[in-house]
């Protein structure tokens, strides 16, 4: 009887120790993330939006809470900077396996880039990571308000969209702008992401 009690006590003690260490590790990780974020400027808060993903589901600004997001703008028929930007995002995705990181590519040509067309584009380009969403805003007004709220500007002409990747923290704060076509900017972004994981 005493042996069983000792074994039970030992198992309970191991569980408590494991749980305590997990809590301490989690708190330390949270402090590390806060330390990295405190070094980054806050440019504003992500504006409200409503869009439809390539998988035909609604996505709102509330869905961004609790995760780190990298947001960029593109259009599926773009033959200039969009393929280069998406290649950069593909590389970032391959280098960052964290489930707390999400990627959002928003079309600036909602007339052409329907959710069905975005889904086809995803398949053709072999963008298979489920953390990467392709989004079409409900209408041009929402797209314009969202882009202006992110401080990237809206021209109404898809070919004049921003080449920047925007870092959004887990509280929907805008934390940085990184030119996807500038190696130094991309390296800086990847360095930040490594520290945040």
Language-model-detected regions and their locations in the chain:
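C-terminal motif of bacterial Sec signal peptides marking the signal peptidase cleavage site
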Residues: 19-22
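Bacterial signal peptide processing site
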Residues: 24-26
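Short active-site neighborhood of thiol/selenol oxidoreductases, capturing the structured segment around
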Residues: 61-89
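Bacterial N-terminal signal peptides that target proteins for export
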Residues: 2-10
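N-terminal "domain-start" segment that seeds a small globular fold
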Residues: 29-62, 87
